[in-house]
């Protein structure tokens, strides 16, 4: 789907970025030094000027002039098109030589308000670089490490006001509260607006569900994301949750959140009422969508504490504490990505979301994901890691010890059994077969040698001939009931996993059994 927001009826809608985020491993290839995007930016002939930093008061004045500073964001229509004074301020920013102004100029390019030409010229003067588009400038910022530089004074509040230019009389985006004093400058500079207002995708809250036999809209081959807690199983169809981004749900008495990160190519689930998930008051968190992306990973926010979270990794970006302090993290839950028929065969008593969500959407197969699937690149700016293709599907895991690991999903689904680490001492990635469920488990001293069967009849075979059935929460040995615990894995595109875990090692296929 291609979400397009009319900026007060004065912004050209055709220029807005398509998005649907309102709503992510034996021998291994070590993580490299982050790479700059190769084709987005070329060195310009304009030499970068050398100048002293401007006084803070002067920087603040330029930023206010450039974006038509308003106390009432709903009156921002008077800023469009930019006034001669705003354009003069942009030109002065480019000639200033002050590197603190690079990120704000790129932020302004994120919105198409008839100022592309002046902004490009200012950035060329200020950086000595040039780019073909706004995305290229953002990726240059990420790849060159400029996002780690000191930001201008009042940067968080200024960027919140900049994005408020997208507001309408009906919306009051909580950007100022979300950016807050504890969001570090490097993160703030990397935040990219996707063209969608917070909660515009209508997150679901304890949506209605039905038993498997009662549903009438899912064909056997439809993709679902399955979650199991205790004895209860529930399927979250892609065709539904891809529209909404966030599902705040309760399963077997546990408050959970299922996040579909459209740009990341998958869904993840977390506890939202247990350790790390509950609010300071001890209540389950309630999450919404922000319309913001960090390295093309959808960001969500806690609607009670106005706190930003990475919707793919489940890590908080800000909130109580000071910048640089340990960040809170949600407890991840294993998610099986598989077909409806496979899930139903595994869990005959499963429930599934009712198609009657109370929201009018085209819930036909593929409608919500069409634009993302058709794109060969990440939907939004990312920092390149060229060890794998940007949108190579992977299954990632953070073991109890050692670096994060990434398995190529195609290899796991084809081979059905891929190990990492010494026999019996590492982890094992398993799959029922192409297009079916995959998961990662601790080897626990067991040496797995091959896989047999497909679908619900799949079994992993150890070197003593023992058969192990793949379950969401553990590998279970047939006959003895012995269990090897599941490691909370995440399935999505390479860029999403590598961006959240840059120290990741990629499992080498040549060392697998």
Predicted regions and their residues:
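Bacterial signal peptide processing site
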Residues: 25-27
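Bacterial N-terminal signal peptides
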Residues: 9-21
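Structural detector for internal amphipathic alpha-helices that build alpha-solenoid repeat scaffolds
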Residues: 47-56, 76-96, 104-107, 117-129
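Bacterial N-terminal signal peptides that target proteins for export
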Residues: 1-10
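Ser/Thr-rich, Proline-interspersed low-complexity disordered segments
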Residues: 29-52
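Amphipathic alpha-helical scaffolding segments comprising HEAT/armadillo-like alpha-solenoid repeats
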Residues: 53-76, 98-109, 131-138
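Mid-to-C-terminal functional-domain signal that highlights helix-capping/loop sites
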Residues: 71-76, 106, 121, 128, ...
């Amino acid at each position: 789907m291609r979400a397009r927001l009319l900026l007060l009826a004065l912004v050209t809608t055709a220029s807005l970025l398509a998005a649907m985020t309102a709503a992510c491993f034996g021998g291994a290839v070590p993580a490299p030094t982050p790479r700059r995007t190769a084709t987005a930016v070329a060195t310009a002939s304009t030499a970068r000027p050398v100048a002293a930093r401007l006084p803070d008061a002067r920087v603040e004045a330029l930023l206010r002039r450039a974006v038509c500073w308003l106390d009432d964001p709903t009156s921002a229509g008077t800023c469009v098109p930019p006034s001669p004074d705003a354009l003069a301020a942009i030109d002065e920013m480019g000639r200033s030589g002050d590197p603190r102004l690079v990120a704000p100029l790129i932020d302004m390019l994120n919105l198409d308000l008839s100022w592309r030409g002046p902004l490009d010229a200012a950035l060329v003067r200020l950086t000595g670089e040039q780019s073909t588009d706004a995305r290229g400038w953002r990726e240059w910022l990420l790849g060159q490490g400029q996002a780690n530089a000191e930001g201008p004074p009042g940067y968080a509040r200024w960027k919140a006001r900049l994005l408020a230019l997208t507001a309408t009389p009906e919306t009051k985006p909580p950007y100022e509260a979300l950016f807050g004093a504890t969001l570090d400058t490097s993160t703030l500079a990397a935040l990219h607006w996707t063209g969608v207002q917070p909660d515009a995708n209508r997150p679901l809250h304890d949506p209605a569900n039905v038993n498997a036999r009662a549903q009438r809209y899912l064909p056997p081959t439809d993709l679902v994301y399955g979650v199991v807690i205790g004895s209860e199983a529930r399927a979250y169809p892609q065709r539904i949750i891809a529209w909404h981004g966030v599902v705040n749900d309760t399963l077997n008495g546990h408050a959970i959140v299922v996040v579909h990160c459209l740009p990341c190519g998958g869904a993840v689930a977390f506890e939202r009422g247990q350790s790390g998930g509950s609010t300071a008051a001890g209540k389950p968190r309630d999450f919404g969508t922000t319309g913001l992306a960090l390295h093309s990973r959808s960001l969500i926010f806690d609607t009670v504490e106005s706190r930003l979270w990475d919707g793919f990794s489940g890590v908080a970006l800000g909130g109580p504490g000071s910048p640089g302090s340990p960040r809170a993290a949600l407890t991840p839950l294993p998610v099986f990505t598989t077909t409806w028929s496979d899930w139903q065969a595994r869990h005959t008593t499963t429930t599934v979301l009712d198609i009657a969500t109370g929201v009018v959407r085209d819930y036909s197969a593929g409608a919500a994901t069409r634009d993302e699937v058709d794109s060969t690149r990440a939907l939004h700016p990312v920092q390149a890691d060229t060890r794998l293709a940007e949108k190579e599907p992977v299954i990632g895991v953070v073991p109890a010890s050692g670096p994060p690991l990434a398995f190529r999903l195609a290899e796991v689904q084809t081979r059905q059994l891929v190990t990492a680490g010494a026999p019996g001492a590492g982890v094992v990635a398993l799959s029922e077969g192409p297009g079916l469920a995959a998961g990662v488990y601790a080897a626990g001293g067991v040496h797995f040698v091959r896989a047999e069967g497909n679908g619900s009849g799949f079994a992993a075979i150890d070197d003593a001939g023992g058969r192990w059935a793949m379950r969401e929460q553990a590998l279970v040995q047939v006959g003895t009931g012995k269990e090897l615990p599941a490691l909370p894995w995440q399935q999505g595109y390479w860029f999403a996993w590598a961006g959240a875990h840059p120290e990741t090692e990629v499992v080498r296929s040549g060392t697998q059994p």
